[in-house]
């Protein structure tokens, strides 16, 4: 099979993975309207083509939280990576490290902090959920600090799990889920051998000690479901800000006022995100939400964005809309499921090449030159409706 884009990795992953795993990563909440709009809205953002700009000295390098990045991309925190490839978090982290970008380890990773951190040279980032068990949160932060994690990504858009219809149909949840998952596994031999048999243990490595002796996926899902905390407020985050002395990023911002609150709180960064369309269906896509947020807080706080990014052109679009850096989620997971570390490495190379093409043809020699001026201005048909008002200048 020829691989030339993330969409090719998606097709390959669908063949390799048991359906419950493929649809868990590929699906979204409710009718998946926001999931679709994340991709579609971003694809409608039109860029200005510029010519004869002498682009021979183009550079993708940038700096974030005093870290040098080879391009403005980091791998997002994605749960259960170790179920998509053998010790998947380690493989993805190695690919990111080799490319000179950060890897973010999820709270609900298969591989624990202590397994992933020593496998790479670059300090990784760590993602933490808001949980009722503050003792677990404090312990996780202590482990992250001990492992040398440089940045904390604090996910705040999950006070309760989203309603994901696909999971019930695919076997991730619902009646007879364990038997359905088993039958799917044995009919997907490549995955069964590489991950099912040789990728053990399949614990959630950062959590397993808190569950005693879990017997299956339902034990982890049950523990998490009972520990998400809907009572959380900005005040509850103060002890984390006091405890964590490195950069702290608030993930799950879609409203300018929440972005301003993050600045007042003292966060170092925010992630404009709707959790990949997996939480509340019907909310704005990240591409639609980003311009107003950038208008409110650009320059006061680092702005990251995720949800809907599938290629290097999308990265350039997000930066033009106001992001400083983007996070890749599903795109790298498709590649990981298809070819492990090599797949993620190849995807990152593709994204870098695509970014260079987009920057060359828009006349942006550096990341700082990708701005609102890079967008086609004043043409509502080319921009999603919610983005058109932020465009300034002449049509090109």
From Swiss-Prot:
Domain FMN hydroxy acid dehydrogenase intervals: 1-380
One GO biological process term: lactate metabolic process
Pfam families reported in the protein's UniProt record: FMN_dh
Protein's membrane topology: Peripheral membrane protein
Binding-site positions, FMN: 106, 127, 155, 251, 306-330
Catalyzed reactions per annotation: (S)-lactate + A = pyruvate + AH2
Cellular localization per UniProt: Cell inner membrane
GO molecular function, one term: FMN binding
Binding residue positions for substrate: 24, 129, 164, 278
Protein name: L-lactate dehydrogenase
Role, per record: Catalyzes the conversion of L-lactate to pyruvate. Is coupled to the respiratory chain.
